[in-house]
Swiss-Prot record:
Transmembrane keyword on record: yes
GO cellular component, one term: membrane
Membrane association type: Multi-pass membrane protein
Entry's localization field: Membrane
Protein name: Putative uncharacterized protein YPL238C
Keywords: Membrane, Transmembrane, Transmembrane helix
Lineage: Eukaryota, Fungi, Dikarya, Ascomycota, Saccharomycotina
The keyword Nucleus is assigned to this record: no
Chain segments annotated as transmembrane: 22-42, 55-75, 88-108
Further remarks about this protein from its record: Almost completely overlaps SUI3.
Length: 129
């Protein structure tokens, strides 16, 4: 029932795994979950909170491609006989979207609490990644 609500296909049957179908399903599910996540963290109606919620949900849905690349690299049987087992099939867009999500997560999670501020070591860790 939850799978139908989120648009995620059943991952138990390996015969139904196709990357384009999963990409759209994971993108829809991650967008929905990110809206729920940011709604609970930014409950006030200030313009700053609504802007952070929009940017955060966009970057979360963009990073679904990166999560999908991880899934297909580690669970795809075709990768077992690959001549280059450590060549990850990431595109430049999926790498940048994942890094964008991490940057926004660190900045906005630190900015959501008025008693805390983004620490320089947290930001430098994100920039190194």
């Amino acid at each position: 029932m939850l799978e139908l609500a989120l648009g995620v296909p059943s991952l138990l049957s390996a015969s139904t795994l196709s990357r384009p179908a999963l990409a759209s399903s994971f993108s829809n599910a991650s967008t929905l979950l990110s809206f729920v996540f940011f709604f609970f963290f930014f409950k006030d109606s200030s313009p700053k909170a609504s802007a952070m919620s929009s940017v955060g949900s966009f970057s979360a849905s963009a990073s679904a491609e990166t999560l999908l690349d991880f899934f297909f690299f580690f669970f795809n049987p075709a990768n077992k006989s690959s001549p280059e087992p450590f060549s990850l099939p990431f595109t430049a867009a999926s790498k940048s979207s994942g890094i964008t999500f991490l940057v926004f997560f660190f900045f906005f999670s630190a900015g959501s609490n008025p008693n805390s501020a983004a620490k320089s070591e947290d930001i430098s860790c994100v920039l190194i990644i």
